[in-house]
Amino acid sequence: MRKFVFFVVAILIQIHTTTSQRNRSSSPSGFLDLQLEKCPQVLGCRCVRDSTRNIQCFSIDESKLLEIQKIYGSNIQRLELHNWQHDQLNFDIFAPFPQLEHIILRDGDLESLNGTVIHPTLKVLSIENSELTSSSEVCRLLSIFPKIQSLSLSKNYFEKFECDTSNTKLKILDLSQNRISHLEVPNTLRVLNVSRNRLTSFENISTKLTDLDISFNKLSLWPSFDDWKFPNLRSLSAIKLDLQTGFQLDAPLLNSLNIDGASLRYLNFHQILTPKLKKFSARYLTELRNIAGRLPSTVTDVAFTDTMLRTLPADFIPMSSTNHMQKVSFDFSTNQLLCDKCLLQWSLPVYAQTSIRKDCNLTREEIESASCKIGVVANDTGIQYGKYEKPTAISCFSYGVPSPKISWWRFRPAEKLGSYDPITDEISYTNVSETMKESYEIQSGGSLLIRSPNRSHVERYVCVVENEYGKDYGIYHFRLDYLDWYSYDVFNSVFWGGLATSLIVCLISFLLNITWILTRKSALWWIQRAERLSRVRKMVEAMEKYRVRQMESLHEKYTKRVQIVRDNYHQQVEALRVSYASQQEKFQNYKAAQVDAVHSHLDAMRDGYNNQLGRVREYGSKRAEQLWESYERQVNRMRTFSLQHRLKMMRQYKVKQRYVNKLLESLQATSPEVQLENEEKVRAALEIPDDLATIDGSMDTPSRLSRSSSFHSLPEYVIDEQGNVRPGIIPTNAPSIRFTTKPTTSSISNEASTSSPSSSGAHRSPDSPPEKR
């Protein structure tokens, strides 16, 4: 029973607790936070660290700045803008923010900058990853920023930067990742970053700098001590320098030096005057072969990796207290290390940080206990190689305590090349010929430099070392390395370069041959074409002359035959007229009694005359038709002959119809005088008057002759009652003529006066007596 009571009480307590919690959560304060937001929201902007004085915006323009001023106020100190929406920026739009100290513009398309309003509080200006190209605009802006200290213009498109104004407090300038090849900066600078540009020299770089970054430039020459001293420089970054020798530096306060990835073959610490150097980085120096001098005693971090070094100077790492050596970070790696105990004396201070135990199987005690008074290691070094006509250094792997003096000799011919004293760091060329001085040079550290190796320098070289314990020597063999001739760099490989050159020569010769063949073919084709066209022109002229001659001959024959027919016709008509006139005269003297008989007889005579005249006319017309048809057949035959020969000539000589047409036009072109002369001849032959009227009866100038019936038919003639011959018309029973004559006034009158005897009745003579009814 008690258990049941306790169970019921527990259930009631749980129900009460749940109900009270629901009541609390259902209150308005449980759903709404009535406190004001610390940072108001503007579309595209946010507060950095919930501060209204540090605003970051994305993809905005000038209109959004007014909204920012209204929402966040005018007390903004840092404004960061990403993706500015215009290609121009006028800094006057920031005038409503009098406390603005930092302006950062990133990832925009800015091309132009301007402004006139002075911003007295601005200290930092950064315009990165834009498209600025004019340094003069930037230099003008410095005048409106009197307190500016830092300016960043990285990732733009400057090809030169010229701004050496003195009225500025600018201390930090970042010009990295541009295209700058010429540089002029203010003398007030203390930090300069010109990495990843196109600088080829160190002109106009201030020596008052404390930090300098000149990495990834095309520097081929390093300035000397006299031209380049940095009394205040503390950090220098010269990564990926395109230098092989000549690196030197005078910076007494330098703490950090970085020359990673440089092309240095030789490094002389006697010329690197950095007594306070703490960090030295020389990683990935794949061409480094020799080192001279020693590190400063203050160095704490050293790195030499991926080099071609075979040893280091015995005193390269300074011997100091054990505690100091434990703090030094030393990173050294090479694939050609000489495992000689005396040549490994340099590793004693940093033995624990090297891989000598692994690579050479030597302990520190073994190296330290070795007796190294004097000696030269030459037998284990092998042949030393150098590239053709590229400066190459031959190392003398010597040792001794104290450091021995090194002398170089050429084995054959036996000539002295020079000497080096490591204690005084002096190089001597005593008793050395001028020829040897031109070819060889003694470097600091005792290595022999061959200035421009060729086959004459392939020889044995003797390195003689000497100190208070005696003298020793070693012979080193030098050979030329032709591996570069087969490298994959086409422009630096003899093999691939020769192959590419041969291909280019073959290609050029091929193109020249093709050009010569095409030129020759074109010239021959042009000559053959000229000859062919000349032959065609001559043949066309000959054919045209032949055609014209034949056509003239046909025309003359046709004219003669028509003239013969016409003369025959006139003769017959004249004979009939004479016969008719003589018969008429016989009957004119008869008296009135015989008038009727005479008239009937005259009518019979007239009918006979007309019949004979019709037969003569019909014969002449048929003969003219035959002549015309024969003439047309001969003309068509001549045209067909000319056309066939023309087509044959076009196919044989491969000429176009257009060219032949031009030739024919030039040959057939005759002057108007010749045409008029021909028309006059035709008019004279056909007896056509010059004042021939037109169809409508108006008198105009004589037009050119056209084909008419006079060419193909005979003229009509009749004899009137008086016995005179006059033009007449063709009787209705006459056969049709090929071409009808044009009607004229005279022909119409003749047609009206001429009629058949049967229809008009008897024609009376004016002398005959009147007829009796």
From Swiss-Prot:
Residues 349-479 form the Ig-like domain. Keywords: Disulfide bond, Glycoprotein, Immunoglobulin domain, Leucine-rich repeat, Membrane, Repeat, Signal, Transmembrane, Transmembrane helix. Residues 746-763 have a biased composition (Low complexity). Residues 733-745 have a biased composition (Polar residues). Coiled coil: none annotated. SMART domains: LRR_SD22. LRR repeats lie at residues 52-73, 74-96, 97-120, 122-144, 145-167, 168-191, 206-230, 233-251, 252-275, 296-319. It is a single-pass type I membrane protein. It is found in: Membrane. Residues 1-20 form the signal peptide. It comes from the Eukaryota. Residues 725-773 are annotated as: Disordered. Residues 21-493 are extracellular. The chain crosses the membrane at residues 494-514. This is Immunoglobulin domain and leucine-rich repeat-containing protein 2. Glycans are attached at residues 114, 204, 361, 379. The lineage of its organism: Eukaryota, Metazoa, Ecdysozoa, Nematoda, Chromadorea. Residues 764-773 have a biased composition (Basic and acidic residues). Residues 515-773 are cytoplasmic. One of its GO terms (cellular component) is membrane. Disulfide bonds join 396-463.
